[in-house]
Amino acid sequence: MRLLSTLLLVATTYPLISATLSKTDSKKAASKAPETKTRLSDTSVQSRGLVSTDVKAKDIVLEHRSYCAKKLKERHVSADVLGYVTPWNGHGYDIAKTFAAKFTLISSVWLQIRRKGREAYQVTGLHDVDQGWIKDIRKTSKSTQIVPRILFDGWSYQDFESVFNSEDEIEELAGAMVQTAKDEHFDGFVVEVWSQLGGQKRQELVHLLIHIGEALHSAKLHFILVIPPAVAPGTDQLGMFGRKEFDQLAPVVDSFSLMTYDYSSPQRPGPNSPISWVQACVQLLDPESKWRKKILLGLHFYGMDYSALGATGEPILGNRYVEILKEHKPKLLWDQQIAEHYLEYKKNKGGKHAVFYPTLKSIQVRLDLAEELGTGIAIWELGQGLDYFYDLL
């Protein structure tokens, strides 16, 4: 506990670092962990009494790969559930196939759209598209929609200005997206663009996204928009996407993937997603609950490992987390205020560390909150967590 207090004290002297869905360059390296075999169980984690604040390291080590095979198609979340999959984490592809029926939407992080010149657009990343995997998903769950993430990659400020000032540019941009979806047999797209302008040009972005949404809907395609948190992490300040923009876009957006994670950073160590902050981010966007079912509350399946030396930290995935539990046998501590577990351990020469990583209990609390608020869930990302997490969905 002393270490955690030290980390949080150090954090207050550092500036805010904003979060984006694609803030995963550091997570890419961490994702390349050795895969472990899953095990099957006749009972769910709920029935085994594992969803608890009083969780033991040894129980996680023993049970984390054991999910209930009998209830793979049984859903506990009534609203939409979106799961992200990344090309650099092969286990996520397997998780998506195994638990496909628990997801209404699966988004593979494959694509970029680039502006090649005047009224000329190209969708790249198509070499990553795995049609066999898509076929397997649809075979397992006919109702699950495949909606790849598409990122506005390599765009200059002038590129955005050119599009904002021309309806023809917008039409060509939207047309390239629609044609790609038809060619590749996608069900729609998750669009990530809002954070790239740092909160500037909001009304121009709204205008662009309304046109994209109308074009996708005309082709009977889903439109999911990634949005940053309504309250800037680590502050009481409003974020770069607020209620005004939400109300303008809600009629043409099918779902909003809300980034309620990455609350802390190596420069500002602490919890991944304090529960009160998560709740505030939803309520500020839609205080009257008019469009709540369109909000997908962001849920992280990765954690952070912070060092007391030099205010450093790195992402931590399931395999590494279990290794720490095995090696150090730490006590897991539950913080009721943030609704997260954390642990502390000491490396031989690396000093003291604090780890915030999701547990069955922290996930269940957020699923309960989503149910209470009337929202869905968006998980970043499949394969980073522990296999028994999916019993909860």
Swiss-Prot record:
Keyword Secreted belongs to the record: yes
An example Gene Ontology biological process: carbohydrate metabolic process
Gene Ontology cellular-component annotations: endomembrane system; extracellular region; lysosome
InterPro entries assigned to the protein according to its UniProt record, in alphabetical order: Chitinase_II/V-like_cat, Chitinase_insertion_sf, Glyco_hydro18_cat, Glycoside_hydrolase_SF
Highest taxon listed in the record's lineage: Eukaryota
Cell compartments where the protein resides: Secreted; Lysosome
Name of this chain's protein: Chitinase domain-containing protein 1
Species this chain originates from: Xenopus laevis
